[in-house]
């Protein structure tokens, strides 16, 4: 569920219709990218981009990571985005839930930003102050962008963020395709080599970002495997002790005519039934306690979702572990020789 949530939020953030213009060499880190302000104007001249009420869907943005000081004086690392209202043209999944878009001296926070900041939700209520450096801002809006990392961001007026970060450039320019193709936007990077630009689809950028977290996902599977191995060995110890006291009982049953395969199946059924009980209890606890739980990570937050597929994998793994843990003790219990059964 952790791996699925992390992968889903990164894949959902990127759109195939959005093309990002970055500084050459910064294709894997938008925060390190520097793009000249003129690139935004040039991008608007590309034909075939999406139009809204006569405005071309092009947004120059500043992305930055920095600590923010909240109303309760606590400080936490946050993901900041400096934007203009044109950002809504290229990110149509962003919807203002309450308040309005920020003006200078104001910010708009994502629906899940309090999880990223490890703060109670009321701290980011409308009208609350928020400090970046020595400058105080007022929260004037809340927004959502379902299933994306943007929901954990804090959006500033672009000029404010440029001033505070002392930069005269953008991090990127995002262009939304209409009839145009990716190659039409990429052609700008070849025409203006002096600007040292690189073009990448937004989905491609976040796919690269997802590959960066592949070792973390591998560690998640490794941790699960270690926990499973511990459960198997713990079960082996328990069942060896439980079945050892039943060797005489098994011998008696064999002596009166029950064969070993039938007794082996009986012992395994007992073990699997006990395992299934524990698995179902753990599944119920997971559904009620973890489903919808939000976890912060470096680029945002993701939400755990206990889907039917996750439930099937969990229950199936529990039954498999019960089977593996029962076989060796059951075979050992039935191994001692016994006299031939009596016949009438």
Predicted regions and their residues:
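Short cytosolic juxtamembrane segments of multi-pass membrane proteins
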Residues: 331-344
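Membrane-interfacial helix-loop-helix connectors in multipass membrane proteins
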Residues: 292-307
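Peri-transmembrane interface segments
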Residues: 2, 6, 182-233, 242-244, ...
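Transmembrane alpha-helical interface segments in multi-pass membrane proteins
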Residues: 240, 248-294, 313-317, 321, ...
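Faces of alpha-helical transmembrane segments in polytopic inner-membrane proteins
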Residues: 226-237, 321, 325
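Hydrophobic, regular-secondary-structure patches
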Residues: 1-79, 97-100, 163, 190-191, ...
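Mechanotransmission and gating elements of multispan inner-membrane complexes involved in transport
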Residues: 13, 50, 69-75, 101, ...
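Short beta-strand boundary microenvironments
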Residues: 76-120
